[in-house]
Amino acid sequence: MRFFPLSLAGVFLLAARVVVVVVVVVVVVVARRRTRCVDDPVVIVRRATREAMDAGADVGVGIVVGAECGAHPRQTTTRIRPAQPSHEAREHRRNAARVMRANASGVGAVDARALRATASATGRRVSSASGSRITVSRRRVRAMATTADGERVKKLQNGSDIRGVALEGVEGEGITLDATTASAIGRAFADWLMVKTGAREVTIGVGRDPRLSGEMLRDAMFAGMAASGAKVVDMGLATTPACFMATVTPGVEYAGSVMLTASHLPFNRNGMKFFTSAGGLDKPDIKDICARAAAYVEAGGLSVNAPSGVVRAPFLPTYAAQLCDIIRKGVNSPTHYDKPLSGMKIVVDAGNGSGGFFADLVLAPLGADTNGSQFLNPDGSFPNHSPNPEDKEAMEAGVRAVLSSKADLGIVFDTDVDRSAVIDASGKEINRNKLIALLSEIVLKENPGATIVTDSVTSDGLHKFIKAKGGHHLRFMRGYKNVINKGKELNAAGVVTPLMIETSGHGAMSENYDLDDGAYLAVKIIIEAVRRRIANEPSIGQVLETLEEPLEEAEVRLKIVDPDFKAYGGNVIESLLETVNDTDHPLFGKSSPAEDNYEGLRVCVDEGDGNKGWFLLRCSLHDPVMVLNFESQVSGGVKIMAEEVGAWLIDQNFSKLDASAVHALYRTP
């Protein structure tokens, strides 16, 4: 190889070329760093937020607007400066958050015009904004969702549960419960649990029903819980009662547990139920957790990916073994103790929810023939019928299964198995008032003279049935937690109250941790059925022959169009009470308020010839709605009562109450 000597001028020329190359590289790198916001909107969000917060603002927002990443958009970076006290800025935090809220379907958009409006409202300057939009990918949406609206999180509270829309697919229902929100709720629950227990480290189990969004929300909750320092356990497919039992079962005893479920609601919904060893959380607890979660969502930086090290420990087999043991002890067969259901044919309709285990892990091991059971496989699309023991189609499907397989008993569960109904060998549906009557028969034999607590819409026939069995009936109010808590209150006061149950099928027994457990109720009925069979006594269906049932019944919902709907509904009820108490007013004929109105106003109506009907007007627990129930013992009785109530509503001119549903009851041919 030959080397040619360079002149001094050549050396300088080569050095100059190297310098030019280096300068070009530096310029390109700097340019790319400056335009990184075009490639990654998340960087802008975080940078501007940090800058604003460093300057003393409550909220900082960065925004990029233009075409899809990788193109050449009109782009601008905004910097928000505080121009008024932070307490005023907090009033507009929600508007700023909405600017960055992402659509949980995977597509989000940021609008500079909205940012300008928010900046104007808060008194903060925006350096420039073009008004065009940028669409970002699902991965970036997740990061951008850290500034989601905290108020939206608080609105997910549904009494003592959390409920929301987790999937798209139903027109008009946008997503309200996404992965980021689930992560925040998981972290908030872990925080709440540590404060509640005083422990620096807690273990939390998470179970789910088969809903399509369940695994996504589970992973996000794990991420949030782990971020708070909690140990997390994946309980897999579970039931709501099983999740509670995991907090009290020796050798398990999680500090808390969560069940991901939305009960019988459509496939796109999901939610959470929370437990400690003291039972399900109450409304104030859920409010606290939602407030904590809202703060986490507004702060941002939430992970939605399940951490490594999650322990998988399915709990359903343990729970099923507990139920088997209860049946063995309850039947106490002298000849078939281990298989007390030998010779019984029992079919289960799980509605493709979590209840299929009951056939495979409870009934079959105890000797029952479960052939004819249906919809046992978990399927979150619920392709066959709504998994709801109150649903007409679900009960009809259960009846067909019992009759076609010639079963002795059928059991219908809801999705998460905290409710159930049964069907006797003749195909008689035993749900609602009939289910309460059957369970009352069972517990009153074990606890003579005891009190049964129900919700407000139970029938007069049920009241007579309980009284005839020697029991006391307290007709309380709607909401299964209200019913259960009333029973707990009575027991604490020394009033024996073994059963607290809603007509929906939510039923709890004091002997079973005051837990609303559909599988436990089914177990009690199975034990009773086997005992009666062994003793050659009348069947469970025959027990209900003395239960008076209404000839007609109806329920309608009247929408209230008023911001303060609870106060408006209260005024309607007060006006109705005044009318009913007006002895000179012929509107309702021979009617009077029922005794012990704990909810709304229940009016007893004399229908003649010794027949008694009633109607109940009450406010919904959560919605801007008034609910009107009718029950009659005569043909056409509901129509007559509805017409009188409808005429009264017209006369009173309640302009913000949509009474069209009650008018339809008597105007329909």
Language-model segments: what does each one mean?
Residues 2-16, 31-32, 37-48, 52-131:
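N-terminal chloroplast transit peptides
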Residues 409, 448-629, 634-669:
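Phosphate-binding and adjacent anionic-ligand microenvironments
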Residues 191, 195, 203-269, 361-423:
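N-terminal small/polar loop signature for handling phosphorylated ligands or for N-terminal nucleophile
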Residues 18-30:
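Long, low-complexity Q/N-rich tracts
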Residues 226, 235-240, 287-321, 325, ...:
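Proline/glycine-rich low-complexity loops and linkers
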